[in-house]
Amino acid sequence: MSTYLIGDIHGCLDELLALLAQVNFDPQQDTLWLTGDLVARGPASLDVLRYVRSLGPAVRMVLGNHDLHLLAVYAGISRNKPKDRITPLLDAPDADELINWLRRQPVLQVDDQLKLIMAHAGITPQWDIETAQMCAREVEAVLSSDSYPLFLDAMYGDMPNNWSPELTGLARLRFSTNALTRMRFCFPNGQLDMICKDTPENAPAPLKPWFDLPRLVDPEYSIIFGHWASLEGKGVPEGIYGLDTGCCWGGDLTLLRWEDKRYFTQRAFKAEAEINNNNGFAAGEEVQH
């Protein structure tokens, strides 16, 4: 029995299957953790969702900002952009079923036995584990409820960007969503910066990557995240693992086998990298909430 953690798939099904074949993944025995952004930009978002859903309890995933954007597009709140390449999913006969499954997936995973925490963007330095779990449960509750379109309509925006226990309602949900699915840089006090998308070495002062600030999360826990392809998994402190290595931009799909901390990679198939590059995508370009 092995625990495998994989970075952002972004509709790259062939690379996912090739990567899982490298480690002889067995859904009857193994557990697969996915950092979110299953969909968009790659060629096979529909088939990725079908495959991941078919794995049932073998999968522990979190939602990413592109997954949330898909939900908003399907609900008629946001516009379907051709570069996201999700039209086959939107038009699929099982789209309702897949969307209803997707919106019931978590935005945070915590395993107290393995001492693992996973969120698409990471954990804001303003939260301890208990606060992160509380805020994640609030987002998950509204996403799985009948009022989820109201939340999806309100999630777009960069404010508030500073955590306070006094936050309530949609403002609180928006902060939590941004912290869990969009965050990269923070100010020294932990306040989110939602503007800079650069690499850490090119970020203006006083911004720092969220993982370089003192954090409230128990240091016995490791944090797994995706979202930030331009990091290429490098430059993170001990106990922090960035697994998005930009497969849909022509990079790799990366897998970490937790038991021995061994990495496996599958290079993007050239045709898909060329399609995205020719469309003028910037590595790590994200949906704007």
UniProtKB/Swiss-Prot annotation:
Superkingdom of source: Bacteria
EC annotation from Swiss-Prot or TrEMBL: 3.6.1.41
InterPro entries attached to this UniProt entry: ApaH (IPR004617), Calcineurin-like_PHP_ApaH (IPR004843), Metallo-depent_PP-like (IPR029052)
One Pfam family of this chain: Metallophos
Keyword Hydrolase: yes
Similarity section: Belongs to the Ap4A hydrolase family.
Name of the protein in question: Bis(5'-nucleosyl)-tetraphosphatase, symmetrical
Organism: Yersinia pseudotuberculosis serotype O:3 (strain YPIII)
Name of the gene this protein is made from: apaH
